[in-house]
Swiss-Prot record:
One of its GO terms (biological process) is translation. Part of the 30S ribosomal subunit. GO terms for molecular function: structural constituent of ribosome. Belongs to the chloroplast-specific ribosomal protein cS23 family. It comes from the Bacteria. Probably a ribosomal protein or a ribosome-associated protein. PANTHER family: 30S RIBOSOMAL PROTEIN 3, CHLOROPLASTIC, OS04G0461100 PROTEIN. It comes from Synechocystis sp. (strain ATCC 27184 / PCC 6803 / Kazusa). The lineage of its organism: Bacteria, Bacillati, Cyanobacteriota, Cyanophyceae, Synechococcales. This is Probable small ribosomal subunit protein cS23. One of its GO terms (cellular component) is ribonucleoprotein complex. Keywords: Ribonucleoprotein, Ribosomal protein. Signal peptide: none annotated.
């Protein structure tokens, strides 16, 4: 799914982007501007660091972002990180395409 397609399926001003990797998952947020997007944050890597907390801090520092939008993005990030971590804990691998199918409102890229 392209960023524009994801943006059109969920009417929001922001979109969660995920790098789906074997040893890490990375999360970032883009702002939807017109028919395109603009990077809002850098990528934060889990479990290398507390990506969720870093994302939360970054979004809270941008006071112009509505609380509802912050909560929505952080809830999506929580679901993706938990899903990835649960798979790692079970020694399972899932393809990026399968992850994209589970989270159609999130834009995925990665190595598998």
């Amino acid at each position: 799914m392209t960023t524009a397609e994801a943006a059109s399926t969920v009417h929001t001003s922001f979109i969660l982007k995920v790098l789906w990797l074997d040893q890490n998952v990375a999360i970032a947020v883009d702002q939807i501007v017109g028919k395109g997007t603009s990077p809002l944050t850098s990528y934060f890597f889990w479990p290398r660091a507390d990506a969720w907390q870093q994302l939360k801090d970054e979004l809270e520092a941008k006071h112009w972002i509505a609380e509802a939008d912050r909560i929505n993005v952080l809830n999506q990030a929580t679901e993706v990180i938990n899903f990835w971590q649960d798979l790692k804990n079970q020694n399972k691998q899932i393809s990026m395409a399968e992850a994209q199918g589970k989270f159609p409102e999130v834009v995925f890229s990665g190595s598998n």
